[in-house]
Swiss-Prot record:
Free-text comment on the cofactor: Binds 1 zinc ion per subunit.
One of the protein's GO biological processes: riboflavin biosynthetic process
Name the record gives this protein: GTP cyclohydrolase-2
Organism: Pseudomonas paraeruginosa (strain DSM 24068 / PA7) (Pseudomonas aeruginosa (strain PA7))
Pathway listed: Cofactor biosynthesis; riboflavin biosynthesis; 5-amino-6-(D-ribitylamino)uracil from GTP: step 1/4
Length: 205
């Protein structure tokens, strides 16, 4: 995979000022972003998150998922610590794209859960790839993370690319009546570590 650094700029946010680093995956043409704060290249494990693009949750305030809540929570946690990195990866809809995500939502409106909808459309349950993270983190001088995630697949993916996950930091945000079944399905079928609140609810909620 050929991922190249393009440019960096300041990014003031309600949480504080970050530096925004732009990267281009030359094979896919996708553009990815890293947001950093503080000195993250000192060798100590860095508080971090891999966040896949979610237009509906991140920008349109959807309550169907927890993505927007997790994005805000991760940025707030980094700002509180004064040091950290968030990789914003262009992998909408767990890798199936925005329009297919809307198609999946339509199937969910008809009774399918989030995994069943993907499978009915001919996709895998989760088609995301995290190979781009290694060159992005290497450019930033980061080799060890305290990773904010509930998804064990992200931990395994980073470790397979020789990035140390020194700690998994749970990031449980935004549970509501609209996403309860979605989160239960992620726990029950995708192995997300969401605690006893969601375990076993996929079939009953």
């Amino acid at each position: 995979m050929s991922v190249v650094f393009v440019a960096a700029s300041k990014l003031p946010t309600p949480f504080g000022e970050f530096t925004m680093h732009g990267f281009l995956d030359e094979e896919s043409g996708k553009e990815h972003v890293a947001l950093t704060m503080g000195d993250i290249a000192d060798g100590a494990p860095v508080l971090g998150r891999l966040h896949s693009e979610c237009l509906t949750g991140d920008a349109l305030f959807s309550l169907r998922c927890d993505c927007g809540f997790q994005l805000e929570g991760a940025l707030a946690a980094i700002a509180e610590e004064g040091r950290g990195v968030l990789l914003y990866l262009r992998q909408e809809g767990r890798g199936i794209g925005l329009l297919n995500k809307i198609r999946a939502y339509e199937l969910q409106d008809g009774g399918a859960d989030t995994v069943e909808a993907n499978l009915q459309l001919g996709f895998g349950a989760d088609q995301r790839d995290y190979a781009m993270c290694q060159p992005m983190l290497a450019h930033l001088g980061v080799s060890s993370l305290r990773l904010m995630t509930n998804n064990p697949r992200k931990v395994k993916a980073l470790e397979s690319y020789a990035v140390t996950v020194a700690e998994r930091v749970p990031l449980q945000k935004g549970l509501n009546k609209h996403n309860r079944r979605y989160l239960a399905t992620k726990a029950g079928k995708l192995g997300h570590m969401l605690g006893s609140l969601h375990q076993g609810e996929a079939e009953t909620t």
